[in-house]
């Protein structure tokens, strides 16, 4: 994303989110940057975003069992994490928290649904008795399926950037602590990656060099066809989702927790007319990622939400569409900062919707 993107103008806090960098972890592939500190967004040593209670207290996840008898969990991707929230106390998890029962933010930026499930499995020893598990998800699986050349493996799903996550600079984290050479190589990879992301001229040079150096190198170990259609990849994702729901149901029952699935908000998945700022931000993204239009439209939403609801019902999991909380809003209200990230007001609306459905 260019620094000239309108999000930086309308939401200056976005710079702090933009500067965050994922950290490699086995099986989940990455977590949010651990121990990240800034004016708008902060994470703990586990990469979990800070949750702030109504009284102003910070929730210490490793010490949860010492301070609370029970907690709620909300899990998903960057919308749950709270990208573009103006503060840690303006996220959905903080809005859902009470001073007695915190809601822990297990939002992992860029995570697909399998990664969400795995992250919960790794984090669950940290929690006291779990009262509610809220899954707020949906867009990342659709976005991955819409990307040209993305891979969705039968029975395994897929992740964003899986080619680079098997090469540089992320896998180098495995050996970074063992010797100085690995550490220096890791620093070099990260420096190249950041400049490639931020500097168009540098990016063009790297592409030209790689095209000459490796253009004729044969491909190997292709496990699936990269030309698979959006519809076929989406079909694979939905089949995988059904398997995940069975696991989620068993995990929730083992904790004695109430489990609900909430389809997350997305541009054009509701009846809200876009505000001037929303149209400007989404329009800028659409120029760079035209594949967004494949899923960010009313017809796709109607079909996809129906399919997810059926899988939820088959697993015995209540399904709710949070886009209903936005349907009645007009173009005078800013809710989206891009295709699926929310303003503070949007986070509050979604939190109120989740709370209402969970307490019904």
List each model region and its residues.
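Histidine-centered active-site loop/cap adjacent to the catalytic His
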Residues: 38, 241, 309-321, 335-360
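Conserved, well-ordered alpha-helix/loop/beta-strand core segments that scaffold catalytic motifs
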Residues: 133-137, 204-327
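Interaction-surface signature
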Residues: 5-18, 114-225, 264-268
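Serine-esterase "nucleophile elbow" of acetyl-processing enzymes
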Residues: 51-109, 113-134, 342
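Solvent-exposed, polar/charged alpha-helical surfaces in well-ordered, non-transmembrane soluble domains
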Residues: 94, 118-121, 243-246, 250, ...
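Short catalytic/ligand-binding loop motif for oxyanion handling, primarily in non-cytosolic enzymes
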Residues: 81-84, 112-114, 141-146, 267-273, ...
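N-terminal secretory targeting modules
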Residues: 1-71, 86, 126-129, 146
């Amino acid at each position: 994303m260019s620094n000239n993107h309108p999000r930086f103008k309308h939401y200056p806090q976005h710079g702090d989110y933009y500067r965050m960098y994922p950290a490699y972890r086995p099986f989940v592939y990455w977590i949010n940057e651990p121990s990240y500190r800034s004016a708008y967004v902060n994470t703990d040593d586990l990469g979990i975003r800070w949750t702030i209670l109504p009284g102003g207290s910070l929730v210490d996840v490793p010490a949860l069992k010492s301070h609370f008898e029970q907690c709620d969990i909300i899990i998903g991707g960057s919308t749950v994490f709270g990208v573009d929230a103006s503060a840690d106390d303006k996220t959905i998890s903080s809005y859902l928290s009470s001073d007695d029962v915190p809601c822990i933010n297990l939002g992992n930026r860029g995570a697909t649904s399998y990664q969400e499930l795995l992250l919960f499995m790794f984090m669950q020893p940290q929690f006291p008795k779990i009262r509610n598990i809220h899954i707020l998800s949906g867009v990342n699986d659709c976005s991955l399926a819409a990307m040209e050349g993305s891979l969705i493996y039968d029975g395994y799903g897929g992740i964003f950037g899986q080619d680079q996550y098997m090469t540089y600079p992320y896998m180098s984290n495995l050996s970074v602590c063992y010797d100085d050479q690995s550490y220096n190589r890791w620093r070099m990879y990260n420096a190249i990656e950041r400049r490639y992301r931020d500097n168009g001229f540098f990016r063009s040079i790297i592409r030209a060099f790689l095209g000459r150096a490796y253009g004729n190198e044969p491909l190997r170990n292709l496990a699936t066809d990269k030309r698979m259609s959006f519809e076929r990849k989406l079909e694979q994702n939905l089949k995988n989702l059904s398997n995940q729901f069975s696991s989620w149901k068993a995990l929730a029952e083992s904790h004695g927790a109430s489990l609900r699935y909430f389809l997350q908000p997305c541009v054009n998945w509701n009846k809200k007319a876009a505000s001037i700022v929303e149209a400007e931000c989404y329009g800028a993204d659409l120029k760079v990622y035209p594949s967004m239009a494949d899923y960010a439209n009313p017809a796709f939403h109607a079909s996809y939400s129906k399919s997810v609801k059926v899988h939820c019902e088959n697993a015995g999991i209540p399904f709710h569409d949070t886009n209903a909380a936005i349907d009645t809003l007009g173009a005078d209200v800013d809710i989206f900062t891009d295709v699926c990230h929310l303003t503070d007001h949007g986070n509050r609306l979604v939190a109120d919707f989740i709370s209402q459905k969970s307490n019904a």
